[in-house]
Amino acid sequence: MELPQANYVGIAGYLDPDEPSGYDGAGVFVHRRKFSFRDLTKGLSQVAVISERTARKLPSTWLGFHVLGEDGPGRVLGFCNLGPNIATSDECELDSRHPGSILVLFADGHVQTVSDGVDQSIYRKMAIRAD
């Protein structure tokens, strides 16, 4: 049987969601927590919610997801740490199948292209819900 893969993941912050501290990440998707727009104090246009990830390093599916086990959270969560499309990065880092950039959905509904050369501090800041 072949299951569909998830090429879009929720943003957990800039910490690796596979690590225990990743559950309490600074992003919008955090284990067993809910956030509303009022919690995104940076402004909706500044907070990344969903982005591309190819699943080349961590084949995944939204079906039957469970947070326990090896790479559990990383199957549906991504994080913004080093930069997009870095070949040597962790499997939870964002990447795409097209060269040069990734597409990111922000909390206000706009989609933005983020280039591979984005400044690391900007890349990390877009992944957190509050300053």
Each language-model region and where it sits:
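Surface-exposed loop/linker segments characteristic of extracytoplasmic
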Residues: 1-131
